């Protein structure tokens, strides 16, 4: 049986259940594709959370190799997990029974008013290159770990800017037909931290292109904390280079810039998305919060479908402070930012899952709001 299905939120192929594929089988299948195959690779080595069991890995350093590899695996009905930066991924301790296709492409082309990046290009390196070239627009997305190809999948956003606002087009491999085509933002169903690419396995991102500001000015500053750091009013612009520096400082202060020596950065970034409460429920939610923590000012933000609340604020007010549950725990909240679930060096995926469940359920019990995880999960259920 061949075709595609989504299991545990990950794009994989549908196959008859059976044993895991072996490295030798994959090498034979992928001979001539240009992929490099390794077996028994611990996925903990390839994810920023540093957890995850073993898998067969096929590394693709060119777009041609990536396309040929996915086509061959799909044709053979072998389950596929696409992996690039590994920054938004939680893999179970048993690993993955199919083939992990690592997207290791890295090309970046700068133009007069935009940038084209291959899917595997390091995202922050792409942002840095645009700023250095005098192009504005992406600077608020500085310091976000991961790959360029993942940004439209998640509709990555930070400090008031989302990928959907700047994306010109995305190059896709259609897995049903094997064809390659370009798609515009109107086809991608963008929403808050989501797109049709996140919830469908129908396409593989090969490259992304962004429309940028050729005068080197930033996108309008919409995030109060960032505007204050730049001594600017909300809605104003500043030089992209200055905004990038300010964003990197703010992210580093919250443990959101990768540093191998700092366990506060051994995370998937923000683990939960900020919940959007329907307008007709917001007063009920306010009452629940006030009943638990008293008459406090609740940070709220306008959203298309209601009112957006701060997940980090809710987590802390529910009793889960920075560093919870304590120094002895293998997985705990960051000591800098309650929205990051971190591996303190010895955590397994099961430890991260247990922490996520406890925090999610605690917030739901106290405030009646269910937090939704942002990372893709493989082989675990939250």
UniProtKB/Swiss-Prot annotation:
Any one GO molecular-function label of the UniProt entry: FAD binding
Q: Which Gene Ontology biological process is one annotated for this entry?
A: cell wall organization
GO cellular component terms, A-Z? cytosol
Q: Does the keyword Cell membrane apply?
A: no
Which keywords label this protein? Cell cycle, Cell division, Cell shape, Cell wall biogenesis/degradation, Cytoplasm, FAD, Flavoprotein, NADP, Oxidoreductase, Peptidoglycan synthesis
Coiled coil where?
none
Q: Where is the FAD-binding PCMH-type domain?
A: 50-253
Its subcellular locations are:
Cytoplasm
Q: Which Pfam families match?
A: FAD_binding_4, MurB_C
Q: Which cofactor does it need?
A: FAD
Q: Name the InterPro entries on file.
A: FAD-bd_PCMH, FAD-bd_PCMH-like_sf, FAD-bd_PCMH_sub1, FAD-bd_PCMH_sub2, MurB, MurB_C, MurB_C_sf, Oxid_FAD_bind_N
Q: Which reaction does it catalyse?
A: UDP-N-acetyl-alpha-D-muramate + NADP(+) = UDP-N-acetyl-3-O-(1-carboxyvinyl)-alpha-D-glucosamine + NADPH + H(+)
EC numbers, comma separated: 1.3.1.98
In this UniProt entry, which cysteines form S-S bonds? none
The record's active-site residues are 193, 270 (proton donor), 374
Q: In which pathway does it act?
A: Cell wall biogenesis; peptidoglycan biosynthesis
Question: Its principal location?
Answer: cytoplasm
- Source taxon at top rank: Bacteria
Q: What does the UniProt record say this protein does?
A: Cell wall formation.
What family is reported? Belongs to the MurB family.
Matches recorded under NCBIfam families: murB, PRK13903.1
Q: What is this protein's name?
A: UDP-N-acetylenolpyruvoylglucosamine reductase
Q: Which gene encodes it?
A: murB
